[in-house]
Amino acid sequence: MLGVTAAAAYDVPDATALLASGNLVQALQACTTAYKSNMNLVNDNSVRWAWGAVGMALFQTIVPPNSTQYPWNDCRTGCAQCSPDDSSYSNSQSNHPGGANFLFADGSVKFIKSTIAMQTYMALGTKANGEVISADQY
């Protein structure tokens, strides 16, 4: 972990107070500075799912695992139901280089490479489109 956790660095208790105090600019600047300095804003990738918030426990298959081309980072605003960290648009992330472990509905765990073909990865993320995917595709 680098420096402080994302929660500690970007926690804002009340959006109204934030606007009134003028700290909104400071909060956005802190987020921008951290992002530009390559501080890993999602520096707790492998444990966020355990927090149980919707945006922490779900992910989509639009962006490949551990994407560096399209990183889905967020800054906290303290608004439990409206900030980016409560969004359901998160990509899968792992501390494993080159991919991530996935738990499948049949109970098996498989390592999915970050270089997986996007059509295959998107098909793995569907429930009822009827795709048949052989294991050699991922």
Predicted features, each with a name:
Residues M1-Y138:
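Surface-exposed loop/linker segments characteristic of extracytoplasmic
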